[in-house]
């Protein structure tokens, strides 16, 4: 008999080992600038082939933050399957927490999940429970100019850079209505 729990275990293994495509965009470059990343470290963090391992290697020195700011995260957190000890499960439900970066939509997420799952993708139903894509506000605004001026008044050598908060804030509720949120 086809044991869905065994298949789910393989899906989980593949999700856990998947490395989503890094997003090394203008926000990423600005973050590296703001952090003063230079030389070999910057080169490694700008290399799509090395950014994952470099961020992980930094560990508590900001590695987790750098990793989350450069990659969509995939975290399978809840698994439910089987009813009784003497029944082979025919279905398993896996809840996966996915944190996207700005510009990564549902189609992008689905493509990454299918790439991770590989040849099992046609045997898996992907259901989107929440579609709250990451958002960002433009920083070429009068409000951004005021923020920069205030920071420079306090410290003329300070660098002001749009940040990326991984996780969630209330900004996701206001931006769709046209609000600029920093």
Give the label of every model feature segment.
Residues 1-22:
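A short core secondary-structure module
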Residues 2, 11, 108-117:
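Short amphipathic alpha-helices in soluble, non-transmembrane regions
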Residues 6, 21-83, 90, 107-111, ...:
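An extended, acidic, His-containing surface patch that forms the Zn2+-binding/catalytic region
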Residues 10, 88-109:
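C-terminal catalytic subdomain
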Residues 15-19, 114-122:
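A common structural junction motif
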């Amino acid at each position: 008999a086809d044991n869905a729990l065994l298949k789910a275990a393989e899906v989980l293994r593949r999700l856990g080992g998947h490395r989503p495509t890094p997003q090394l965009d203008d926000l990423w470059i600005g973050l590296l600038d703001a952090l003063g990343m230079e030389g070999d470290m910057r080169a490694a963090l700008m290399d799509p082939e090395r950014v994952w391992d470099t961020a992980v290697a930094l560990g508590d020195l900001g590695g987790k933050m750098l990793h989350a700011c450069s990659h969509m995260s995939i975290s399978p957190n809840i698994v439910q399957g089987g009813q009784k000890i003497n029944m082979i499960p025919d279905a398993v439900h896996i809840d996966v927490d996915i944190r996207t970066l700005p510009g990564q939509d549902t189609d992008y997420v689905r493509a990454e999940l299918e790439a991770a799952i590989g040849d099992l993708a046609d045997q898996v139903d992907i259901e989107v429970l929440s579609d709250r894509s990451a958002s960002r506000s433009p920083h070429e605004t009068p409000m951004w100019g005021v923020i920069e001026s205030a920071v420079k008044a306090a410290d003329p050598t300070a660098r002001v850079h749009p940040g990326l908060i991984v996780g969630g804030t209330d900004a996701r509720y206001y931006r769709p209505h046209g609000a600029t949120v920093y």
